[in-house]
Amino acid sequence: MSVVTTRARIAETLTEKHTLGIEKVVATDSWRVGITSREKKLERINISAEISRRIQDEAIAYARNKGIPYLPGINGIAWKLLRLKWLGYTDQINVVMRTVPAEWRDFLTQIMENTQMESMYSELRKVRV
């Protein structure tokens, strides 16, 4: 047996032991990681649902006050605008606003200027799964 093959076998054995050790650690800690990630995911879902409820309630009230029909897609557009504002893409915000019917642009501007919505959205972005 040559020196090269012996060194290769030793390196292979050490690699296997290291890999098995990592797998053992991952197996024992995986339940903790799983529980933590589920809790974070539930927290994100709760915050997201609260934002959606508020947007929808405000949209329905806006439609009633203005006497215009409720636009079901306005919730998704508001989400997109909140995300774009949070990321700082002002040019993209203008592009999206041009696609929205004129009677709903004031509503979307109000949503984007609402500091409470902005703080909730930034709180949502802080929770990472």
UniProtKB/Swiss-Prot annotation:
<protein>
    <recommendedName>
        <fullName>Major capsid protein 1</fullName>
    </recommendedName>
</protein>
<dbReference type="GO" id="GO:0019029">
    <property type="term" value="C:helical viral capsid"/>
</dbReference>
<dbReference type="GO" id="GO:0003677">
    <property type="term" value="F:DNA binding"/>
</dbReference>
<comment type="function">
    <text>Self-assembles to form a helical, filamentous nucleocapsid mesuring 400 nm in length and 20 nm in width. Together with capsid protein 2, wraps arounds the DNA and maintains it in an A-form. Capsid proteins probably maintain the DNA in A-form by non-specific desolvation and specific coordination of the DNA phosphate groups by positively charged residues. This certainly protects the viral DNA under conditions such as the extreme desiccation of its host.</text>
</comment>
<comment type="subunit">
    <text>Heterodimer composed of major capsid protein 1 and major capsid protein 2.</text>
</comment>
<keyword id="KW-0946">Virion</keyword>
